[in-house]
Amino acid sequence: MLNIFFGITVSVFIAAVTLHTVGTFKDIRILKNISKPFLIFSILISHALIIVSYLPDSSLLLIYGSLALFFALAGSTLFMLKDKTFKIIAVPFFILSIISKLLVTFPSFRLYRFPILVSILFAVLYATGAAVPFLIFIKKKSAIISAAYAVMILSIGTYTYSAVLSFFGELRIYTIFLFMDSLSMVFAAFVKAKKETEELSSPLLDFISIMACTASQIFFAAGSVMMQAL
């Protein structure tokens, strides 16, 4: 079942990125607009994968995970509407989604015997990283820059430490997937922040940031499948 969801995620992402790429380089606004709902849908599917893989461990994780998905879906739907009022209302939903993901991530990594410090860092990283794909579409420079540097700092320390601890253990492959996920998120956020701060208008930068965001979610979904298989 997880493999099916993973296949759906990758397929939808490929379709969305194709539409976005063609729309960007050909300056076809409707294609760029169509691609955004597909990308958000794929993000939600990939987030659902890791929650499903934790189901045998704790019903509490299912509750937190379901809340995270609900708030993310509600926030995404509101944010896609043209009225600025709806975009403002969407912000609290994104915050609640991030908090819910923080709650589901921390006990999950504790279940797999990560040291307490690593568990906290992982949880904070994913709480921050969960917002990055959505921030790709937001024009607020301060929010993008904050997300870019927060993910960068947290990922370097957290993933380096955890990779060393688990390299010879059963979580080696899973950690590699998460490490690649983190690097992709960092790269996407950094490119977006650089573009906004320097006020660059380049279809190539748009393409690079959306591809990095795509890679991040695919690695995230793949890591979820690997965790379920362990």
Question: Model segments located where?
Answer:
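Polytopic alpha-helical membrane-helix bundles and their juxtamembrane interface segments
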Residues: 1-230
